[in-house]
Amino acid sequence: MSTMTPAEIVSELDKHIIGQNRAKKAVAVALRNRWRRQQVDEPLRQEITPKNILMIGPTGVGKTEIARRLAKLADAPFIKIEATKFTEVGYVGRDVDSIVRDLIEISVKQTRETEMRKMRTKAEDLAEDRILDILLPGARTVGFGSGTSEASGDESNTTRQTFRKRLREGALDDKEIELDIEMQAPAMDIMGPPGMEDMTEQIRSMFANLGGGKKTRRKVKVKEALKLLTDEEASKMLNDEEVKTKAVQNVEQNGIVFLDEIDKIASRSEAGGGEVSRQGVQRDLLPLVEGTTINTKYGMVKTDHILFIASGAFHLAKPSDLIPELQGRFPIRVELDSLSVKDFESILVATDASLVKQYQALLATEDVHLEFADDGIRRLAEIAFSVNEKTENIGARRLYTVIEKLLEEVSFSAGNHTGKSVLIDAAYVDRALNDVAQDEDLSRYVL
């Protein structure tokens, strides 16, 4: 669990997301409250439940990214789900309980990887021993008894240590060896009707277990063999029951569910009878968000302390169009701002993995040096903002389209620019994009 303070969390989020300070503060406090709750003694700790968050704002302003980065910081099981994927119980389609089942699968995978990392050093030693046994057959079985055999044993032990040193230095990486590796059962793609994902998953697991334990002899290079055997040894040391228990506990205490497009299941007051199943999905979500127990293949999972973050643009519906009971389950409401020209400029250059840095790195692989002038960045931001205003506002995602169109020619003919620098200034941007940006009909299709 993360022990970062709210200020530290916001500072980390600032490296990847521009603006939206109110939303960042809300999620930072929610994450910190999880740590605070763990410091509280029982039975009061059990009574403290997370305050779920409703983010309201247009598409492309950072709603999903805030939740995704938060989960990464917390190292917590995280799932992003579109609310529109679900149907009311009794209708054909997925029911909301599958959210928790998917989340527990993610948690099991995370927990398994964490536990395997802890055992990595010991597993690597065992893998090295197995490789040395193949490279030096009989070295371990030499001599107990006579003085000659003892001397021979010392000699073989010295040889073994020499080979181990060379193995660790990478001197044997390209040598080919034969070894027996546990076969992975081929993944079977079983098609099932909507809403029956659990049954198809169980059938898939059953077929996967049928092929388990079989070994196959393969000829591989030492470097690859070391990796394969390390993974195999680490898997052997894992206690599956312990992994399941930790995974369930991790979901119950630290799980984060991001419910996107929640406004699409809000029933507008003037709408007709077609809204029934939307209301049904909202009612099905109620116990999940409030706290219930879901039966999964890893055991019963309580949702009382899972943090739910819902988001929606609410263009056509309003938060008050959600059924009152569900509104009450999301006490913290945060409105995200639309992006300005200044925000677009910052997104292009100020974040840790900004678009400008990404394209510079991509073209640098072909020895093409992209240089962005300040006026070029400014003009790019202005065009992206302008196209958003004139057509559909898709937020920061517009920058992907604009910059891709801008660098289309350079990317295509990168081989002709090898060893050269390409300066992207305002004049270059205007030459590449002005015609498209000015023509509203054309920008609808191109940008």
UniProtKB/Swiss-Prot annotation:
UniProt keyword terms in alphabetical order: ATP-binding, Chaperone, Cytoplasm, Nucleotide-binding, Stress response
Binding positions (ATP): I18, G60, V61, G62, K63, T64, E65, D260, E325, R397
Highest taxon of source: Bacteria
Gene3D superfamilies: 1.10.8.60, DNA helicase RuvA subunit, C-terminal domain, P-loop containing nucleotide triphosphate hydrolases
Main location: cytoplasm
Localization: Cytoplasm
Gene Ontology biological process terms in this record: protein unfolding; proteolysis involved in protein catabolic process
PANTHER family noted in UniProt: ATP-DEPENDENT CLP PROTEASE ATP-BINDING SUBUNIT CLPX-LIKE, MITOCHONDRIAL-RELATED, ATP-DEPENDENT PROTEASE ATPASE SUBUNIT HSLU
Oligomer and partners: A double ring-shaped homohexamer of HslV is capped on each side by a ring-shaped HslU homohexamer. The assembly of the HslU/HslV complex is dependent on binding of ATP.
UniProt function note: ATPase subunit of a proteasome-like degradation complex; this subunit has chaperone activity. The binding of ATP and its subsequent hydrolysis by HslU are essential for unfolding of protein substrates subsequently hydrolyzed by HslV. HslU recognizes the N-terminal part of its protein substrates and unfolds these before they are guided to HslV for hydrolysis.
Protein name: ATP-dependent protease ATPase subunit HslU
Source organism: Paraburkholderia phymatum (strain DSM 17167 / CIP 108236 / LMG 21445 / STM815) (Burkholderia phymatum)
Gene from which the chain derives: hslU
